[in-house]
Design a protein with these regions (language model features):
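Accessible peptide chain termini
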Residues: 1-2, 20
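Low-complexity, intrinsically disordered or signal/transmembrane-proximal segments
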Residues: 2-5, 12-13
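Extended, highly charged
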Residues: 10-264, 270-280, 284-442
Length: 442
């Protein structure tokens, strides 16, 4: 049996690039100067150009402010940082294991504080209403940084724009929900910052989930140091919360004791999520850069899948590496970046494919399907993956089906008890076999 982690593939000395701020990620994006409305306009235009990265320079309801969509995709991030997908996964895993402290800077060195709204009015920001099925305008790419009783948390939470200074935010049962419940039990509100458009290292760290109280900003700092060769710089807002200094927006707010209706909302699977009573957030100040660019992520599209799925890849790869060498993990588009993955391995002995399937499903408990392929197959290419299935997989002996497994809340087909069945497909060649009849010249 293979044991132990494989060595990281990235080369530390050659992976530092000058691109740091969110707006730097927009190099090469489509520029749209025609008037675009926050009400369905961004989604409609994005669909018309096949969801390429795009910057909207003329938002009808937000004079002088801009927005961007389709910025974060795995291939695009790898191209920008000049790394392979496998290296990106290894760097994410390294940062999780090696958190570091960010650097606090003075307010005069923080671009995010270049402008402050005279009176808070969120309706004047480029907050989009993408799908007609949504309740209304939503922040979907903003992260919440909260601190309570010495614990800091940074995470994504969608926010429905209720009125000029209030949003209603969906808190799933994770760390921020636990923090909020604890504060409410004490009759206390929580001071927070809502950050939109930080650099990619912050966005990736905010999308990670940990079983313990690990400060996501320290993971972002490690990523920033590895990819940029510089510390992640934070600035302290007047409410005491520290935020990335080069973010596009930093908004001072508090989680109140009140709840209100949140939803419906088109979630990552493209299905419509329910209406629930969720916490109300009151906004007290809005700061932003000059000509700020609002990150207006489109739910169920490429950025949503990237931010949901990419941070799961390191945990899956680590789990698989415990039993067999693993070179890549790709959370598939058809699985909404969450429910299905393709895993590339190098089998060493008979049965390694099945071992890899079980390890991958353990590494990401929400996953419903995993396909294991050889390292000569591009995990991100569905045509090549299907080719591997058709030429290397025998359904009656290379398939694992598990019943009565804990399912994902994002899967509407799961049972009322939350249980589902899961499937693993082994499309690898047996070790030692003559590979020539199975190799493609295409």
């Amino acid at each position: 049996m293979y044991s132990g982690q494989s060595s990281p593939t990235f080369k530390q000395q050659s992976r530092r690039v000058a691109i740091m701020a969110f707006r730097d990620l927009l190099a090469g994006a489509v520029e749209v100067d025609e008037p675009i409305s926050v009400n369905h306009g961004m989604l409609n235009h994005s669909e018309s150009i096949n969801h390429k990265a795009v910057v909207f320079n003329n938002i009808t309801e937000a004079d002088g402010l801009r927005s961007a969509v389709n910025v974060l995709a795995r291939d695009r991030l790898c191209e920008i940082f000049n790394i392979s997908p496998g290296e990106l996964i290894d760097i994410l895993a390294w940062a999780m294991a090696n958190p570091s402290e960010p650097k606090l800077v003075d307010s005069k060195n923080a671009p995010v504080l270049e402008n402050t709204q005279d009176t808070v009015d969120l309706t004047k920001l480029p907050i989009p209403w993408h799908y007609p099925e949504d309740r209304g305008r939503y922040q979907s790419a903003s992260v919440i940084i909260a601190q309570y009783q010495g614990v800091r948390n940074m995470s994504f939470h969608r926010q429905f724009l209720r009125d000029r200074n209030h949003c209603v935010s969906r808190f799933v049962p994770r760390h921020l929900r636990t923090m909020t419940d604890k504060a409410r039990a004490n009759g206390e509100e929580i001071d927070i910052a809502v950050v939109n458009g930080p650099d990619a290292t912050v966005l990736l760290a905010a999308a990670m989930s940990f079983t313990h109280d690990l400060d996501e900003l320290t993971v972002a700092a490690a990523l920033h140091e590895k990819l940029h060769g510089k510390p992640l710089e934070l600035v302290k807002l007047t409410n005491g919360i520290e935020v990335p200094a080069d973010s596009e927006y930093a908004m001072e707010a508090k989680i109140t004791l009140a709840d209100d209706d949140e939803g419906p909302y088109v979630d990552i699977t493209g299905t419509v999520d329910d209406v629930r009573q969720e916490p109300v957030i009151q906004y007290d100040a809005v700061h932003h850069r000059n000509q700020a660019i609002f990150h207006a992520l489109i739910p169920a599209e490429v950025e949503h899948r990237t931010l949901m799925g990419l941070p799961r890849a390191p945990t899956i790869k680590a789990a698989v590496n415990e039993v067999v060498p693993c070179s890549d993990v790709y959370m598939t588009d058809g699985g909404s970046g969450w429910l299905s993955a393709v895993v590339a391995i190098e089998p060493k002995q008979e049965g390694d494919g099945m071992m890899a399937i079980k390890a991958a499903l353990h590494g990401h408990g929400s996953m419903k399907q995993v396909t294991v392929v050889d390292t000569d197959i591009d995990c991100s290419n569905p045509v090549r993956v299907e080719w591997a299935l058709m030429t290397r997989w025998q359904p009656d002996k290379d398939t694992l089906i598990l019943s009565n497994q804990k399912g994902s809340s994002l899967d509407p087909s799961r049972g009322e008890d939350g249980l589902t069945s899961k499937i693993g497909i082994d499309a690898t060649l047996p070790p030692g076999i003559d590979r020539k009849p199975y190799e493609s010249v295409l």
